[in-house]
């Protein structure tokens, strides 16, 4: 049977987001992407149907923000702001977490699950080490506290998240919590 011409593929598949494999046995750095949006009932986290968060292999020659934007596009979301919010060591690799603030999706791809975000206590370690466990709810809490600070301190973030100001007012910016309320 003759092979179809390359310009007329039988099935068009999207290429991989990165060429770096993601595997629990692969020691490397990886990106964690938290897609979030604001709805009348509060914040929502869009996660892959197969996992708590989206994890993407991150080759050292690529800019992480570009990889995150490719993921936003892949899941057919409309970005508002993409920002690195935290990092941690876990599962034998460095995990850099990005929060991707997106518009509420009109039609959600069947590859994503939509979950309402609840408040959580932050994971805290001791003076010489990280917390023994860090859950997704704690990473999201940290991300919203980080954005609550940036929306007031960074003009670009403040402009892009102006519609989020009322929601973010509920979060005490993390750098100032130690000084007491309203510091």
Regions found by a protein language model. Give the residues of each.
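Nudix hydrolase/Nudix homology domain
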Residues: 45-56, 88-183
């Amino acid at each position: 049977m003759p092979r179809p011409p390359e310009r007329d593929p039988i099935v068009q598949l999207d290429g991989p987001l990165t060429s770096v494999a993601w595997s629990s046995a692969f020691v490397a750095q990886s990106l964690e992407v938290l897609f979030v949006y604001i709805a009348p009932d509060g914040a929502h986290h869009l996660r892959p149907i197969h996992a708590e968060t989206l994890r993407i292999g991150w080759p050292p020659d690529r800019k992480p923000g570009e990889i995150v934007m490719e993921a936003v596009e892949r899941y057919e979301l409309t970005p508002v702001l993409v920002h690195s919010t935290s990092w941690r060591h876990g599962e034998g690799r460095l995990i850099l977490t990005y929060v991707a603030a997106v518009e509420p999706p009109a039609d959600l791809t069947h590859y994503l699950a939509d979950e309402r975000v609840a408040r959580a206590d932050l994971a805290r370690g001791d003076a010489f080490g990280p917390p023994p466990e860090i859950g997704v709810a704690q990473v999201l809490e940290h991300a919203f506290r980080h954005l609550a600070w940036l929306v007031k301190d960074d003009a670009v973030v403040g402009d892009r998240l102006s519609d989020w100001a009322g929601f973010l007012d509920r979060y005490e910016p993390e750098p100032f919590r130690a000084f007491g309320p309203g510091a």
